[in-house]
């Protein structure tokens, strides 16, 4: 099966400096290769420094927006507040397609500011979110770490402001 060849990446997460576990994702490089490659390379940090002058790497960044029952958003490694980030292709890149849907918990999708504004920000769903279909590119799925995702959700608020610092302390690719 082609599924065995899909890349896998991980985030090691800490809450207020305390290790909380690992999130492992498979990336749908067969359906959205450009989007999956952007995320994979940002997990490894292999592309060096971006146009912002910051490393193209999720390590050390945090989840700046967590809403229980909805999603956890992160990936802004340039500003840290949800207003920054950049892709490995430059600042932003176009929506690749909307083939994959937001069907349940653990869906990995691109956060954006409208059509064709993908950078480095992403979100992980806590439930199905069909209203996002056609507006956000799904490119991965959580395959291990449901307990860690639940810890993230526990630190969310309805406003989205996390109740703790939820940081990606390490990340990378898991070779098959």
UniProtKB/Swiss-Prot annotation:
Keywords: Isomerase, Rotamase. It comes from the Eukaryota. Residues 10-173 form the PPIase cyclophilin-type domain. It catalyses: [protein]-peptidylproline (omega=180) = [protein]-peptidylproline (omega=0). One of its GO terms (cellular component) is cytoplasm. Its EC number is 5.2.1.8. Gene3D superfamilies: Cyclophilin-like (2.40.100.10). SUPFAM superfamilies: Cyclophilin-like (SSF50891). One of its GO terms (biological process) is protein folding. One of its GO terms (molecular function) is peptidyl-prolyl cis-trans isomerase activity. It is an enzyme of class 5 (isomerase). InterPro entries: Cyclophilin-like_dom_sf, Cyclophilin-type_PPIase, Cyclophilin-type_PPIase_CS, Cyclophilin-type_PPIase_dom. Belongs to the cyclophilin-type PPIase family. PPIases accelerate the folding of proteins. It catalyzes the cis-trans isomerization of proline imidic peptide bonds in oligopeptides. This is Peptidyl-prolyl cis-trans isomerase cyp5. It comes from Rhizopus delemar (strain RA 99-880 / ATCC MYA-4621 / FGSC 9543 / NRRL 43880). The gene is cyp5.
